[in-house]
């Protein structure tokens, strides 16, 4: 999840494996709602030159948060876009079941996103 639609789009694009026959035509954008009493923890990722290249460090912070079950949601900085945040959901947290998808919108990818890659 991301705090913005643009952030979610970029995060999804970075994980796509593209070729001419398999590039996606559309995606589903979901709006998530959580009750006000559900705390969102901000994970203190050390931001420096190396943090994006050291996934073991950031994964360790995420694993520790997940296993601790302190909060149902955690806010983490995007490794792709500066000043952009992603939100992690801990499905094992007791309050996780209170978080709901309230709207889903199907949208077409703009073909210009893929033209420079020859797909």
Residue ranges and their predicted role:
Residues 1-15, 87-95:
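Extended catalytic/binding region for NAD+/ADP-ribose chemistry, centered on the ART fold
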Residues 14-22:
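Short helix-loop boundary/capping segments at the starts of domains
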Residues 21-119:
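Active-site and NAD+-binding cores of ADP-ribose-processing enzymes
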């Amino acid at each position: 999840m991301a705090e913005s639609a643009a952030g979610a789009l970029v995060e999804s694009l970075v994980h796509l494996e593209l070729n001419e026959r398999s590039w996606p035509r559309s995606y589903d954008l979901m709006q998530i709602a959580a009750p006000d009493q559900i705390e969102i923890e901000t994970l203190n990722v050390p931001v420096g030159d190396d943090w994006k290249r050291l996934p073991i460090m950031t994964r360790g912070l995420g694993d520790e948060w997940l296993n601790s079950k302190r909060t149902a949601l955690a806010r983490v900085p995007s490794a792709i876009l500066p000043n952009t945040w992603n939100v992690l959901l801990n499905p094992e947290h007791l309050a996780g079941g209170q978080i709901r998808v309230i709207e889903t919108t199907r949208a077409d990818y703009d073909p210009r996103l893929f033209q420079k890659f020859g797909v």
